[in-house]
Structure formats: C-alpha cells, structure tokens
C-alpha cells in the first residue's frame, strides 16, 4: 500500500514538473499574474509605477546636478536637449528661460530699469501664457512700458499725487486685460496668461500677481519669504467666488475652473471671463527692504515651482549666486531634469545690500 502511494506521488511529481516547467506554461502564468494585478490591484500597481518614476526622476536630477557643477562643459551637454532657450543678464538681474518639453514657448519676461537717473522704479515681469502665446506676448510688450510711463509721471509729483505704486499697478493690469479681451474676442483667440510684476525702489518692493507664477525673496537670515500667493481653484476663497458666479471646479490631473483652467485668475481667457468665473484682479503686496535686508529674489513661472519648493529654491540659488546667471540657469536645468514638462522661466534679482551684488 505504501509502495503504491509513493509510486503515485512520484508519477504526479514528474507530471507536474513536465507541465509547470515548460516555457509556455511559465509564460501563461506570468500573463495571468499581470492581468490579475491589473484588474484587482490597480491602485497598488499604480503606486509602484509612480514610485519607480519618482526614483528615476530623482536619479536624473542628481546626475544633472553633477553635470551642472562640472566646469568642463557639463551644461553644454544638457543644453543640447533643449529646443529653445532665452537668457538675459544686466547689472543685478539675470534670466534664463527654456521651452523644455513643450511644443511651443508660451513664457515671456521683461526687465525695465533706469539705474542711472532713477526716473522710475525697476520693473520686473514674468508672464506664463496658456492656450497659445498671444496673451503673454501682448502683456509683455505693453504692460511694462505702460507702467514705466505712469510711474515716471508719478515720480515727478509724488508728494501731491493721490496714487501709489499699488494703485498704478492695479489700474494698469486691469486696463491691459480689458484692452486685450476686446482684441482676443474679435479673433476668437482663447489664450490667457499669468502676470507677475515687481517694482523695486530704494526702500520698497511692491509685487502684483495674477495667476500661478510666483515670487520668493531670500531675507538677511536666508529665510524664504513669499512675495505672492498662487491663485488656484481649490483655495477656499477662490472656490466660493467661482461658485457664487455660477461656475464649478473639477479635478482632471489638477483642479480646474469649468474643467478647463488650472488657475482661478488670469489675463485673457475671454470665454471664462464672460462667465465671470475667472477674474483679472491682482493681489498686491509691499515689502520694506530696510526691515528685510534681502539678498535676492526669485520670480518664476510655475515650471520652476512644480519641481522646487520656495525654501529649496532659495537654498539652491543662495549657493550659486557667484555663477554668471546668479543660479538662474542652473535651477532651470535642474527643474528640467527633475521631470518638469512645462516651459521654465526663472529671474533672479540681487539686492544692492548683498555683499556679492553689483552696484544697482
């Protein structure tokens, strides 16, 4: 009886080895496991895949940083992958901008200074377009110049004026939006743009923001001080305003107004402006330079902020202020290699009280 049982088990073992160890059987087993994981454990699989992608991004970022610090030409190797780049350097301000992985470049920037005569405060602007480049180009080519003219008039008779930097900024931003909407509506152009403007005088820094471009300042202690706050649909104040206007927000990778726009305020975007769910009203803040004694500020499109936190960006730039672009070029390249899919524009402005800053 025992011998018969052993013989039967031995026979079953040989049969199982014959079938289970065949290549086609192993292949079918792998396919079955993959299908079972996909249909019954989708979330777990997605988590593993996302973690793997994040790990790859981190490794690529580390490689990029090593190459960026390589004085033997590492940056030139990286730049070969960019379809288009723009750069600017003058006195205490430097800008670096790349098209990156996008098919079109919709970022714009502008710098207007009069360091010799000081007929107006220095004007720095970042404009991150969407739905085409029309809106960003329109605002970039008109708003800074309009601000310059009004600020020059204001400086001539400041003591007797009822205006201020804040009121001039608000008036001109709203005016340029109305003017642009008329033209975009006629041509059925649905383009829009953010608007981040900083006015730098001897004692004050005034920053106006519409959208999700962002400004951050490094104070005397190395702290990251926010100069603006992103206008996002998920924010309670913005969400309530959109709901009161009869609109809605929905999630499609990110929270969007009417399921379309990933910011709650912008210039342009005439279809959403007609519904009153997106507005052009800027938030404006003024900072006392004597109190903060800042070293530098960063103004950038959201391509940077998708890859860096405020604090991380300040630390990164602080370590690279001696570079030709004050670290702007390096942080743009690092953002690209962290996987940012967007256009990336970074402006770094060094303040005159910094020991490393050229005379403003």
From Swiss-Prot:
Leading EC class: hydrolase
Residue numbers on the Cytoplasmic membrane side: 43-360
Keywords: Hydrolase, Magnesium, Manganese, Membrane, Metal-binding, Protein phosphatase, Transmembrane, Transmembrane helix
GO annotation, cellular component aspect: endoplasmic reticulum membrane; extracellular exosome
CC cofactor: Mg(2+); Mn(2+)
Cofactor note: Binds 2 magnesium or manganese ions per subunit.
CDD domains linked to this entry: PP2Cc (cd00143)
Transmembrane segments: 26-42
PROSITE patterns according to UniProt: PPM_1, PPM_2
Primary location recorded for the protein, binned into one broad class: membrane
GO MF terms held by the record: metal ion binding; protein serine/threonine phosphatase activity
Topology term for the membrane: Single-pass type I membrane protein
Entry binding sites for Mn(2+) 2: 128, 302, 342
Superkingdom field: Eukaryota
Tissue distribution of the protein: Ubiquitous. Highly expressed in heart, placenta, lung, liver, kidney and pancreas.
Compartments where found: Membrane
Keyword Manganese: yes
Self-association state and partner proteins as the record states: Interacts with MAP3K7/TAK1. Interacts with MAP3K5.
Function comment: Acts as a suppressor of the SAPK signaling pathways by associating with and dephosphorylating MAP3K7/TAK1 and MAP3K5, and by attenuating the association between MAP3K7/TAK1 and MAP2K4 or MAP2K6.
The protein's name: Protein phosphatase 1L
Species lineage: Eukaryota, Metazoa, Chordata, Craniata, Vertebrata
